[in-house]
């Protein structure tokens, strides 16, 4: 699903995509970025506009999605924004690029491609990131309670390659930690950034990238300890994503 305002094709239709700019507040201005999943292209085209030196690759498994995004969602036809009809994991396996930012935006509420959630995939992503690069993931889950198992499994799986992880719930007016919502996970291998420093960086960045609320998004970071001893590490041999989604009531 996607959407666009006809009067302003770059205006945010779904708020969660603005949260991806927190990766810049965390890791600095990227020079190369990979988006896995295109949809209507809201996030890639915003990054294309807001970071004039940024080279963007997008791996989208469905060629028809690319065609529709170009025709109806005003995704720019520009050398800095390259669209590839490819599965995101296979694209990385065949690539020699190292990115400053990898954005994984290929999960639906009730359908998650399990091969993009596993220990092996995150190892591959880490190999294709610069040492101070950021992996950003859009997941739909809760941060606490019985509907949080998918999120907590992702966090446990990420731990092996990404010692520093930051979670930003898209609160949308309520602060119920047990409610299903978009969660933006940022994962890094570089030194941990203190929350006050992250908030200050987001406040400075917000005006530049046309996201006035970016400071507030940063301040909404989830800081409670994430309990992971009762959820599995996701692997290529065992990634019970469908079972986790069923437990959350998403299937």
Regions found by a protein language model. Give the residues of each.
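Generic detection of intrinsically disordered/low-complexity segments and helix-coil linkers/edges
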Residues: 10, 66-67, 156, 211, ...
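The AdoMet/dcAdoMet-binding core of the Class I SAM-like
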Residues: 9-137, 144-151, 161
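C-terminal substrate-binding/active-site "lid" region of AdoMet-derived donor-dependent transferases
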Residues: 124-194
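Residue-identity detector for threonine
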Residues: 12, 17, 24, 29, ...
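Soluble small-group transferase modules, centered on the S-adenosyl donor enzyme superfamily
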Residues: 1-3, 168-251
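Acidic/histidine-rich, surface-exposed loop or edge segments in extracytoplasmic proteins
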Residues: 1-5, 135-138
């Amino acid at each position: 699903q996607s959407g666009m305002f006809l009067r302003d094709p770059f205006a945010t239709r779904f708020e969660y995509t603005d949260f991806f700019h927190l990766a810049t507040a965390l890791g600095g201005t990227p020079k190369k970025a990979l988006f896995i999943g295109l949809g209507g292209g809201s996030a890639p085209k915003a990054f294309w506009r807001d970071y004039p030196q940024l080279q963007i690759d997008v791996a989208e498994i469905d060629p028809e999605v690319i065609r529709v995004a170009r025709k109806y969602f005003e995704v720019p036809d520009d050398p800095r924004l390259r669209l590839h009809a490819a599965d995101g994991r296979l694209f990385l396996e065949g690539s020699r690029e190292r990115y400053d930012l990898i954005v994984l935006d290929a999960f639906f509420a009730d359908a998650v491609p399990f091969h993009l959630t596993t220990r092996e995939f995150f190892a591959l992503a880490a190999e294709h990131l610069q040492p101070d690069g950021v992996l950003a993931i859009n997941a739909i889950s809760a941060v606490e309670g019985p509907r949080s198992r998918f999120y907590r499994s992702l966090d446990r799986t990420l731990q092996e390659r990404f010692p520093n992880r930051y979670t930003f719930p898209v609160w949308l007016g309520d602060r119920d930690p047990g409610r299903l919502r978009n969660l933006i996970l940022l994962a890094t291998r570089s030194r941990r950034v203190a929350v006050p420093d992250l908030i200050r960086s987001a406040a400075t960045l917000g005006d530049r990238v046309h996201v006035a609320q970016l400071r507030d998004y940063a301040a909404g970071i989830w800081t409670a300890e994430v309990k992971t001893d009762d959820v599995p590490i996701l692997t290529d041999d065992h990634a019970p994503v469908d079972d986790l989604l069923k437990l959350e009531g998403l299937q």
